[in-house]
């Protein structure tokens, strides 16, 4: 009754010298789960961490922390106007209610040379390859919808924003200088979703209203039309040329330079 997709029995750092400077990115932050097994039967005797810190509380905590730092919470319903986007600043919490479209590598490459199957003007593109399940009545349901790494779309994103009038890109990890310039020129923002919160974001999807390129690209790469409620993400690249990712990289390099002298003689 239980499908085991991955199992970590134990772990030991293989490169001790790197242990103290390792950085664990937040992709796995909300995926901690464990079980106590019966050694004779393999039966699950007890779940670990399952109800320890519900994801809803984690997300609320992240949003509350952002607000304490002076950020605003802004609710947007696509289609979104350029005026609404220009009012946003890095650090603001954006809550999306309404339509959203998924798009990964295959779709971005396709859109460079083709028209979109829907009108994307004022809309939101979500860098996501959702886990989907079709019920007995042929209706699709989202079972997991976490963000994927956005930098893979850097070769395409600026052109697609300009071509289709997209107002918001959602993903994780940020994007590069070309995309940042396009956000500024055309009035769009990049929203960083919470890595590893696939179950939480799946709960935000209230309906699947359509799908495009399913046969051509497959489930993860298809363009899914979603209706979402209370989909929260943080502005990390705004329409004024500001990038939190760029700022963090700069400050990190400055701090790293303080330790440039050899540690071991």
Task: Show the residue positions of the predicted features.
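C-terminal binding/interaction regions
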Residues: 1-33, 39-43, 54-57, 203-265
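C-terminal extensions of enzymes
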Residues: 24, 75, 101-102
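Intrinsic disorder at enzyme termini
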Residues: 47-70
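Short, structured beta-strand/loop micro-motifs enriched in basic residues and often containing a Trp
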Residues: 70-80
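Short, surface-exposed secondary-structure edge patches
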Residues: 82-87
């Amino acid at each position: 009754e239980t499908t085991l997709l991955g199992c970590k029995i134990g772990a030991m750092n293989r490169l001790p010298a790197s242990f103290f400077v390792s950085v664990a990115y937040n992709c796995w932050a909300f995926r901690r789960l464990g079980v106590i097994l019966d050694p004779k039967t393999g039966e699950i005797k007890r779940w670990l961490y399952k109800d320890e810190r519900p994801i809803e509380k984690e997300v609320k905590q992240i949003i509350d922390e952002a607000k304490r730092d002076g950020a605003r919470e802004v609710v947007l319903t696509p289609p979104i106007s350029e005026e609404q986007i220009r009012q946003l600043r890095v650090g603001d919490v954006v809550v999306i209610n309404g339509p959203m479209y998924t798009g990964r590598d295959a779709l971005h490459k396709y859109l460079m040379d083709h028209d979109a199957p829907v009108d994307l003007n004022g809309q939101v593109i979500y860098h996501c390859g959702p886990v989907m399940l079709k019920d007995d009545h042929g209706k699709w349901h989202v079972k997991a919808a976490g963000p994927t790494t956005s930098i893979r779309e850097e070769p395409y994103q600026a052109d697609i924003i300009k071509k289709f009038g997209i107002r918001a890109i959602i993903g994780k990890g940020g994007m590069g200088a070309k995309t940042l310039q396009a956000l500024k020129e055309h009035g769009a923002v990049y929203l960083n979703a919470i890595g590893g919160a696939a179950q939480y974001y799946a709960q935000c999807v209230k309906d699947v209203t359509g799908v495009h390129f399913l046969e051509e690209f497959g489930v993860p790469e298809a363009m899914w039309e979603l209706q979402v409620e209370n989909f929260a993400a943080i502005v990390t690249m705004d329409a004024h040329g500001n990038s939190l990712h760029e700022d963090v990289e700069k400050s990190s390099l400055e701090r790293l330079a303080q330790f440039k002298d050899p540690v071991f003689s």
